[in-house]
C-alpha cells in the first residue's frame, strides 16, 4: 500500500503521464522511435522532491528518449530493478551502462556497477546509455512478401505479408510493429563483445564494465523465455553466431539476423538448452592459449551447425579427435552440396539379380524403396579428380526429368562408384529385335523412333552427350514407352592418365561414328556423333538386323568404317518402309558429321511422317452398341445373326 501511495505522490508531484511506475512484474509496450541519445530538458530539473526518497523509487532516463520510474525493494540489485524495464524495450544490460547523475555537478555522471544495491540509490536519478563499442543503427524497414516459409519474430506465427529490416533482418506483421525492439544491432559484433571483452575494451579505449562476467552471461541465458528455447528467433536473448572475421579483420556488413527463424533447424534438431551454451562459454574461458582460441569457434554454436565461410589459417588447426566428432555431426544445410542429398549409402541397397555387364560396368537388379537398377561402374580406386568429376556429372544427371529418359534416383561412392536408376520391367530394344525377334508393325516402329528422338532431343537440350547410344540402352517400358538409359558419364567413359582426362573410343563398334573411331580430335564426341548412333538404331528398326552382318572381324569393321570404306546397306530396309524414313536413315549415317541433321530436325521429320501415314477411318454406319442410352432400345433379334445371311 505504501508503494502505491508513493507512486501516486510521485506522479502528482509533476512527473506527468509520460513517466511510468515500474515494478518487478510490470510490463509496458515499447514503441518504434528514432534512435538518438536522450537529452534532459531544463524543465525536468527540480521536479524531484523528497517524496521520491520516501516512496522507494528511482527515476531512470533510458536510451531512445525514454524514461521510467522503478520501485525498489530491499535486497534488489540495480540489475534486478532495471531488467524488466530494459527487456520490454528490447534492450540488454550487457549492451548498456548505468550512470548516476550528479546533482551538485550539472552534466556530470558517475558510472555504477549493475550489482550495486538499489536501496542505496533511492531518490537518485540514473541514466542508461549504450556502450560505445556496441554498434547501433536505426531500423531500415521495408514491406516484403515472404514467398518462402517464414514466421513473425514477435508472435511466432506464419508470416506472408509484413515488414523486414534490411539491416538486421527483423521481420514482423503490421499489427506487431509496436513490439519491435527499438535498436538495430549487429549481433555478430555482440558475440565478439561477450566472448572477447578484454580485446574489445582495448580496441575501443573504454574499460570493460564489471558486469561483463560469466555469472551475468549465465544469468542472461537462464532468463531466456521458455518459448524462445524451442525456437531460434528471439530478440531478447543472445544467440551465439559463429561468423568469424575475414582475413582483413573486418566483420561482414550483412550478417544474418539472429531473430530470423531457422525453420529447417527447428525440424531436425532438439530445442536449445541453456546449459549447452554455458558449457561452450566455460570451455572458451578456460582456454587461454592461441591454439585453443583457434579451435574454439567450432564449439561455440550450441547446435554445431554454423561454420565460418572464410576461415583464417589459424582456424584450420584442430585439436586431436575433433575430426571424429565432426563426422558424427549432421552437416549444416547451408554448407551442403546439393548432390549430398542424392548420395545413397551402400548398406541401404540390396542387390539381387545380375542382369548383365557392359564395357563400363555391371547392372544388377536391386531393392531401394522398391525395384531399382544398380550399375556398378568399372572404376577401381578412383582418384580425387575422378571422384569430383563423377559428382559434377551426377549433379547434371539428377536434373533430368523426361518421359523417355530413365529416372535417375541416386549414386553411391563407397567401395565402388554406382548409379541407381528406375527399374524397367520390359526388355531392351536389342533383345526385342535380335533375340526375341518381336514382330512390330510399321507404325509401332516409327513411334519407337519418334520417342527415341524425343528423348535424345531433351538430353541435347540439357547439353548432355550420350556417348553410348545403341539399342541395348533403349528400353521398352510398360508396352511401347521408350526409356533411354546409360547416358552421360563422360568421367567413366574416358581414360584417365594421372589427373588428366583423356578421351578414348567408347561404346560398341557397330554404333560408333567414323570420327569417334578415328580419334583425330581431342574430344570427338558431339551431338552429331549421337545422331550417327541413332541412325544405326533406325537401321535396326527398319531392317530387323544389325549392320555389317556379313563382316565377322571386329577390327575389320573398325578399319573400314573409320576409313569411310563401309556404311550400312540401305537396300536391306523393309519394303514397306516410308521413303521419308529411308531418307532420314541415310542422312543420319552420313560419313561427314556436319552433314548430319540434329535431333530437333529429326524429331519434326518423324512427327510429319506419322501424320502423313494412311489411317483407316471409322465407318459412319457402324453401329455403336455401347453408346445406346438404354439396352431395351436395341432389338434382341438384331443381335442374332441369321444363318442364311453372310457374315462380314
From Swiss-Prot:
Compositionally biased region (Basic and acidic residues): 275-285
Feature: compositional bias, Polar residues: 239-271
Cofactors that this protein relies on: Zn(2+)
Annotated Zn(2+) 2 binding sites: 152, 155, 173, 176
Positions of the Protein kinase domain: 349-609
EC number: 2.7.11.1
Post-translational modifications reported in the UniProt record: Phosphorylation at Thr-269, Ser-338, Tyr-341, Thr-491 and Ser-494 results in its activation. Phosphorylation at Ser-29, Ser-43, Ser-289, Ser-296, Ser-301 and Ser-642 by MAPK1/ERK2 results in its inactivation. Phosphorylation at Ser-259 induces the interaction with YWHAZ and inactivates kinase activity. Dephosphorylation of Ser-259 by the SHOC2-MRAS-PP1c (SMP) complex consisting of SHOC2, GTP-bound M-Ras/MRAS and the catalytic subunit of protein phosphatase 1 (PPP1CA, PPP1CB or PPP1CC); this relieves inactivation and stimulates kinase activity. Methylated in response to EGF treatment. This modification leads to destabilization of the protein, possibly through proteasomal degradation.
Keyword terms, alphabetized: ATP-binding, Cell membrane, Cytoplasm, Kinase, Membrane, Metal-binding, Methylation, Mitochondrion, Nucleotide-binding, Nucleus, Phosphoprotein, Proto-oncogene, Serine/threonine-protein kinase, Transferase, Zinc, Zinc-finger
Low complexity biased stretches: 286-301
Activity regulation text: Regulation is a highly complex process involving membrane recruitment, protein-protein interactions, dimerization, and phosphorylation/dephosphorylation events. Ras-GTP recruits RAF1 to the membrane, thereby promoting its activation. The inactive conformation of RAF1 is maintained by autoinhibitory interactions occurring between the N-terminal regulatory and the C-terminal catalytic domains and by the binding of a 14-3-3 protein that contacts two phosphorylation sites, Ser-259 and Ser-621.
SMART domains in alphabetical order: C1 (SM00109), RBD (SM00455), S_TKc (SM00220)
Subcellular location: Cytoplasm; Cell membrane; Mitochondrion; Nucleus
Subunit structure as annotated in this protein's UniProt entry: Monomer. Homodimer. Heterodimerizes with BRAF and this heterodimer possesses a highly increased kinase activity compared to the respective homodimers or monomers. Heterodimerization is mitogen-regulated and enhanced by 14-3-3 proteins. MAPK1/ERK2 activation can induce a negative feedback that promotes the dissociation of the heterodimer. Forms a multiprotein complex with Ras (M-Ras/MRAS), SHOC2 and protein phosphatase 1 (PPP1CA, PPP1CB and PPP1CC). Interacts with LZTR1. Interacts with Ras proteins; the interaction is antagonized by RIN1. Weakly interacts with RIT1.
PANTHER family xref list: RAF PROTO-ONCOGENE SERINE_THREONINE-PROTEIN KINASE, SERINE/THREONINE-PROTEIN KINASE TNNI3K-RELATED
Family: Belongs to the protein kinase superfamily. TKL Ser/Thr protein kinase family. RAF subfamily.
Protein's UniProt name: RAF proto-oncogene serine/threonine-protein kinase
Species, as recorded: Rattus norvegicus
Gene: Raf1
Amino acid at each position: 500500500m505504501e508503494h502505491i501511495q508513493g507512486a501516486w505522490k510521485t506522479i502528482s508531484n509533476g512527473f506527468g503521464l509520460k513517466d511510468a511506475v515500474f515494478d518487478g512484474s510490470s510490463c509496458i509496450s515499447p514503441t518504434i522511435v528514432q534512435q538518438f541519445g536522450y537529452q534532459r530538458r531544463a524543465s525536468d530539473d527540480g521536479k524531484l522532491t523528497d517524496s521520491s526518497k520516501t516512496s522507494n523509487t528511482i527515476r531512470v532516463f533510458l536510451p531512445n528518449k525514454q524514461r521510467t520510474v522503478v520501485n525498489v525493494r530491499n535486497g534488489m540489485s540495480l540489475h534486478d530493478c532495471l531488467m524488466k524495464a530494459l527487456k520490454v524495450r528490447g534492450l540488454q544490460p550487457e549492451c548498456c551502462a548505468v550512470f548516476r547523475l550528479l546533482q551538485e555537478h550539472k552534466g556530470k555522471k558517475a558510472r555504477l556497477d549493475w550489482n550495486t544495491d538499489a536501496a542505496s540509490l533511492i531518490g537518485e536519478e540514473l541514466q542508461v546509455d549504450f556502450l560505445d563499442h556496441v554498434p547501433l543503427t536505426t531500423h531500415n524497414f521495408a514491406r516484403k512478401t515472404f514467398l518462402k516459409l517464414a514466421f513473425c519474430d514477435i508472435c511466432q506465427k506464419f508470416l506472408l505479408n509484413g515488414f523486414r529490416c534490411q539491416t538486421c533482418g527483423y521481420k514482423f506483421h503490421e499489427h506487431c510493429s509496436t513490439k519491435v525492439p527499438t535498436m538495430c544491432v549487429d549481433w555478430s559484433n555482440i558475440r565478439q563483445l561477450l566472448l572477447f571483452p578484454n580485446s574489445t575494451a582495448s580496441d575501443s579505449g573504454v574499460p570493460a564494465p564489471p558486469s561483463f562476467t560469466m555469472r551475468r552471461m549465465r544469468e542472461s541465458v537462464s532468463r531466456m523465455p521458455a518459448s524462445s528455447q524451442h525456437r531460434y528467433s528471439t530478440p531478447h536473448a543472445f544467440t551465439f553466431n559463429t561468423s568469424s572475421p575475414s582475413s582483413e579483420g573486418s566483420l561482414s556488413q550483412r550478417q544474418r539476423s539472429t531473430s530470423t527463424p531457422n525453420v529447417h533447424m527447428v525440424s531436425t534438431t532438439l530445442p536449445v538448452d541453456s546449459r549447452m551454451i554455458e558449457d561452450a562459454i566455460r570451455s572458451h574461458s578456460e582456454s587461454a592459449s592461441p591454439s585453443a582460441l583457434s579451435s574454439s569457434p567450432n564449439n561455440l554454436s550450441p547446435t554445431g551447425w554454423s561454420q565460418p565461410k572464410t576461415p583464417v589459417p589459424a582456424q584450420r588447426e584442430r585439436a586431436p579427435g575433433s575430426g571424429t566428432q565432426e563426422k558424427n555431426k549432421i552437416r549444416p544445410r547451408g554448407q551442403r552440396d546439393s548432390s549430398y542429398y542424392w548420395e545413397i549409402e551402400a548398406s541401404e541397397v540390396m542387390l539381387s539379380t545380375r542382369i548383365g555387364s557392359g564395357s563400363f560396368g555391371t547392372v544388377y537388379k536391386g531393392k531401394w524403396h522398391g525395384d531399382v537398377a544398380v550399375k556398378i561402374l568399372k572404376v577401381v580406386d578412383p582418384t580425387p579428380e575422378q571422384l569430383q568429376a563423377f559428382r559434377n556429372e551426377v549433379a547434371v544427371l539428377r536434373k533430368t526429368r523426361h518421359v523417355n529418359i530413365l529416372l535417375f534416383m541416386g549414386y553411391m561412392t563407397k567401395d565402388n562408384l554406382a548409379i541407381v536408376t528406375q527399374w524397367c520391367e520390359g526388355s531392351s530394344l536389342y533383345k526385342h529385335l535380335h533375340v526375341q525377334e518381336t514382330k512390330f508393325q510399321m507404325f509401332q516402329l516409327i513411334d519407337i523412333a519418334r520417342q527415341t528422338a524425343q528423348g535424345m532431343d531433351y538430353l541435347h537440350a540439357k547439353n548432355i552427350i550420350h556417348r553410348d547410344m545403341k539399342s541395348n540402352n533403349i528400353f521398352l517400358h510398360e508396352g511401347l514407352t521408350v526409356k533411354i538409359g546409360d547416358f552421360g558419364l563422360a568421367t567413366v567413359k574416358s581414360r584417365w592418365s594421372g589427373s588428366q582426362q583423356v578421351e578414348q573410343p567408347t561404346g560398341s563398334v557397330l554404333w560408333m561414328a567414323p570420327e569417334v573411331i578415328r580419334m583425330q580430335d581431342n574430344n570427338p564426341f558431339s551431338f552429331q556423333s549421337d545422331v550417327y548412333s541413332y541412325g544405326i538404331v533406325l537401321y535396326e528398326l527398319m531392317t530387323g538386323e544389325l549392320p555389317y552382318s556379313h563382316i565377322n572381324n571386329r577390327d575389320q569393321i573398325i578399319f573400314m568404317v573409320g576409313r569411310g570404306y563401309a556404311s550400312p546397306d540401305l537396300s536391306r530396309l523393309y519394303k514397306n518402309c516410308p521413303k521419308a524414313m529411308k531418307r532420314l536413315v541415310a542422312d543420319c549415317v552420313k560419313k561427314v558429321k556436319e552433314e548430319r541433321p540434329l535431333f530437333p530436325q529429326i524429331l519434326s521429320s518423324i512427327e510429319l511422317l506419322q501424320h502423313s501415314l494412311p489411317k483407316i477411318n471409322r465407318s459412319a454406319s457402324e453401329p455403336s452398341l455401347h453408346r445406346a442410352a438404354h439396352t431395351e432400345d436395341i432389338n434382341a433379334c438384331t443381335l442374332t445373326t441369321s444363318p442364311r445371311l453372310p457374315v462380314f
